[in-house]
Amino acid sequence: MSYWRTKYMNQSNNNAKFAFFYMLSLVALIFMALSAGMIVFQIINKLIKDIIEQYSGSFNSGSLKFAISALIISTPIYYFTARQIYKNLYTGALSKDSGIRKWLTYFILFVSSVVMIGWLIGTINTFLDGDLTLKFALKSLTAVAIAGAVFGFYFYDIKREEIAGKKDMIIKTFFWSSLIIILAIFIGSLFIVESPKETRLRKIDEVVLNRFNSIDNAINMYFADMEKLPKNLDTISDYSNHLSKDELADPETDKKFDYNVLSEKKYELCGDFRTSNLDQEDIRAEYFKERWPHDTGYQCLMQLVNVREGLERLDR
C-alpha cells in the first residue's frame, strides 16, 4: 500500500512539475516571439522612411525598449524550461503520451496560430491604410516566419513517435538556430536604441520644452488681455495663476530661462539643451520637433503670438 501511495504521489508531483514547465515555457515563448517580432518591425520602421508618418508605421523607441526588455527576460526562461521538458522526455520521466504534453503542446500550437493571424491582420490593415508595400512585405514575412517556425516546431514535436532515449537532430537544430536568430535580433536592436543616459538627457529636454509651452501659453493669454508682449518672465509669472516660478527655470540647473522681445508679436525663449531633436525619428517626438526645433547647447527659439489663429512657430 505504501509503495503504490508513494508512486502515485511521485507521479502527481511530476505532473505538477511538467505542467509548470510547459505553462512557463508558453508564457516565455509568447513574450520572446512577440518581442523579437516587435524589434524587427521597429528596425524596418527605422530603416525604411515613409513620407506619411503614420503612428503604426513609424519608429517608436518606447516599443523598441519594451521589446528589448521582454526579450532579455523571456529568452533564458524559455530555453531553460524547454531544456527541462526535453531532458525529461529523453530520459522517459515524461511520457510522450502524457496528457499534459499533448494538451499543452496543442495549446501552444493554438496560441501561435492566433498570433500569426493577429500579426497578419495588423500588417494588412496598415498596408490598406497607406503603408509602404516594402514595409508590408517585410513585416508580413517576419510575422509568418516567426509564427510559422513556432507552429512547425511544435507540430513536428507532437507527431514524433520515438522520443525516449533518442536524440533528435531537428529539435537540436531548431534550438540552436532559433537562439542564434534571437541573439542576432537583440544585437541588431542595440544599433538603433538610444542609451539610458541619452534617454534621460532627452527627457530633461522634454521637461524644458514643456515649460516653454507653459510660458508660451501664458504669453498668449497676456497678449490677448494687454495687447502687447510682457517685458520679462517675472511679469508673466505675476500675471498668470497657472505658471509657477519653477517653470521659469531649467529643471536640472535651476538657471532661469532667457526671454527677449524681438518685435510687436515676436519673441524668443532661450535655454540650455542636452540633446538635439532635429534628427529625431521617434513618432512621439514629432510635436516638439515641429513646435520647438532645437540643437544641442544654448538655443533661442523664436515664436510668434497670434491671438486669432493661435501660436505659430517661426521658420528659423
How would you describe each model-predicted region?
Residues 194-196, 263-316:
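Short, surface-exposed interaction loops/tails
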